[in-house]
């Protein structure tokens, strides 16, 4: 059954809802802190995408899923990950405006991602939250 191979997709949908809410808050309120949270969540979603694909391969090897089910799962996860990329782009623009910088990718590289930074702390919290659900 397809639902057995879509393990984790419900969690991805909840994660997508959370990043959309944070993006909306960042945009409407011009909230740079919410924008940093969006950037961190986007990184978590990227990591979860890779983990879910890896787990699907393990299920394939055990004969628990089919290749066809894998295509469906991959399409769903990829679409959800693209949504997070768009949210990240919006958040990056909010951060640029807040910090008076130009160039989305330039600013994205400048975000402090070292342990102890706001970005890092949010990333670790969200990663723990969503990986616990896998």
Locations of regions flagged by a protein language model:
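Short, small-residue-biased leader/transition segments that mark boundaries at the very start
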Residues: 1-12
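Hydrophobic alpha-helical segments, principally membrane-spanning helices and signal/leader peptides
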Residues: 15, 27, 69-70
